[in-house]
């Protein structure tokens, strides 16, 4: 019996270190927040870059062309590439010569970066919200249930958009890597959905217990 109590105490201590105040969840929320800010900046900056290059192409202007370049020639891996029938783009970081993004200037490229960027921004933002909620004393709440639900719904919406962009817009054959990446996202969504149900049960039991008291 003493050994049983000892094991229970260890589990309780480990549980307190994972969730609750001054726990692993609290510091994990900081990491998610930093990553969210980093990714969100890139998504917004890339969108601005695509907008400026598109306007420059249509109006034949060179507005901020040193930072947001689009043309038929590009320096790719230290080698100059020129194709009069193809457009390339290169985005640099603000006030810097450091390249941020380089590639083929196509609709598929734009949609891919936009869809993936927005998804990861949402994923990291709700990862931050969920971790922050888990760092509180009362982890069974409507708040965390809502965050988890939004997270797995976002993944289920993202996967078909991701596949459509690659197969239909980018005209890339459905490959094994696309299948496994899509399967991984869906698997995470299923885990999040089951976790949501677990927290729903916990919240219901907690509410019933509060009413009894």
Can you describe what each PLM-predicted range is?
Residues 1-17:
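Short, intrinsically disordered or compositionally biased N-terminal tails of bacterial proteins
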Residues 44-72:
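Membrane-helix exit/juxtamembrane interface segments
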Residues 171-213:
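Terminal transmembrane helical module of multi-pass membrane proteins
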Residues 132-156, 206-213:
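Membrane-helix boundary/juxtamembrane motif in polytopic membrane proteins
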Residues 65-86, 113-115, 146-153:
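Alpha-helical transmembrane segments of integral membrane proteins, especially early/N-terminal helices
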Residues 87-118:
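Individual transmembrane alpha-helix segments
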Residues 162-170:
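Transmembrane alpha-helical segments of integral membrane proteins
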Residues 22-43:
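Alpha-helical transmembrane segments and their helix-start/interface "positive-inside/aromatic belt" motifs
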């Amino acid at each position: 019996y003493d050994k049983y109590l000892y094991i229970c105490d260890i589990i309780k201590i480990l549980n307190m270190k994972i969730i609750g105040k001054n726990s692993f969840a609290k510091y994990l929320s900081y990491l998610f927040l930093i990553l969210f800010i980093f990714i969100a900046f890139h998504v917004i900056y890339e969108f601005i870059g695509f907008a400026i290059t598109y306007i420059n192409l249509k109006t034949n202007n060179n507005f901020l062309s040193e930072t947001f370049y689009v043309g038929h020639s590009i320096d790719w891996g230290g080698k100059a590439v020129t194709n009069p029938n193809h457009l390339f783009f290169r985005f640099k970081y603000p006030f810097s010569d450091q390249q941020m993004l380089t590639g083929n200037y196509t609709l598929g490229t734009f949609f891919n970066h936009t869809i993936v960027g927005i998804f990861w921004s949402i994923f990291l933002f709700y990862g931050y919200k969920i971790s922050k909620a888990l760092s509180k004393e009362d982890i069974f709440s409507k708040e965390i249930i809502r965050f988890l639900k939004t997270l797995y719904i976002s993944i289920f919406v993202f996967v078909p958009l991701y596949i459509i962009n690659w197969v239909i817009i980018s005209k890339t054959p459905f490959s094994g890597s696309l299948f496994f990446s899509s399967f991984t996202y869906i698997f995470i969504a299923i885990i999040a959905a089951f976790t949501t149900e677990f927290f729903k049960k916990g919240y219901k039991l907690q509410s019933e217990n509060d009413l009894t008291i």
